[in-house]
């Protein structure tokens, strides 16, 4: 995504120089405890995230923030991706968003007719895609304006791949909203977030 600047600029420098879209960063702080989630050498163990993170109160908090702060004005016109921990999480987030009156669709390896879903997203019939690893790399949609980081990760590579989905700068998009969902991690290694990177 950084073109010829990849080896020369940090993400912060690239934003300051206008190579990529600037990130307007928001934090949703939860009381979820990650200190007991195991680490497999690269990232959190997904089975542990399933037990600790995929809880209704956390999901509802994310939906309420989107409903309260991202449905009006410029933010209300933006489409987004919610990065989830697994397929079950994508389905639950999509269900909660639709119940709240925000059009959403789960998007994973289980999705029937994924091309149709993506076309409807590009036609603005769907506002949020709730996705897991399927959309982290190799996908580009320049109009993407909101990234919700609902999957805790210790992998800077994965985090930057996901962030990269929304950093394409266009003639009409100068910035992207990044919403970091920040859980408690105690004395353990801090999960990746925009604040941690910068």
In which residue ranges do the predicted regions lie?
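Conserved helicase ATPase core of P-loop NTP-dependent helicases/translocases
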Residues: 81, 91-136
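Conserved interdomain linker/interface between the two RecA-like ATPase lobes of SF2 helicase motors
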Residues: 4-81
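SF2 helicase motor core recognition
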Residues: 18, 129-147, 163-168
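A conserved SF2-helicase RecA2
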Residues: 11-21, 168-198
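Conserved SF2 helicase motif VI
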Residues: 154-176
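Conserved residues at the C-terminal ends of beta-strands
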Residues: 26, 132, 150
């Amino acid at each position: 995504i950084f073109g010829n600047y990849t080896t020369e600029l940090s993400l912060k420098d690239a934003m300051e120089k206008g190579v990529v879209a600037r990130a307007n960063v928001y934090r949703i702080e939860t009381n979820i405890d990650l200190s007991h989630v195991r680490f497999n050498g690269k990232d959190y163990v997904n089975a542990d995230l399933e037990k600790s993170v995929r809880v209704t109160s956390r999901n509802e908090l994310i939906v309420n923030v989107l409903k309260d702060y991202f449905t009006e004005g410029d933010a209300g016109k933006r489409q987004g991706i919610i990065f989830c921990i697994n397929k079950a999480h994508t389905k639950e987030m999509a269900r909660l968003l639709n119940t709240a009156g925000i059009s959403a669709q789960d998007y994973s390896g289980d999705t029937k007719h994924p091309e149709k879903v993506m076309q409807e997203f590009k036609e603005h019939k769907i506002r949020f895609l709730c996705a897991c690893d399927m959309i982290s790399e190799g996908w580009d949609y320049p109009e993407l304006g909101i990234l919700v980081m609902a999957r805790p990760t210790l992998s800077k590579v994965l985090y930057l791949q996901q962030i990269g989905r929304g950093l394409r700068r266009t003639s009409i998009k100068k910035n992207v909203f990044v919403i970091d969902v920040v859980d408690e991690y105690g004395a353990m290694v801090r999960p990746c977030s925009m604040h941690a990177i910068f």
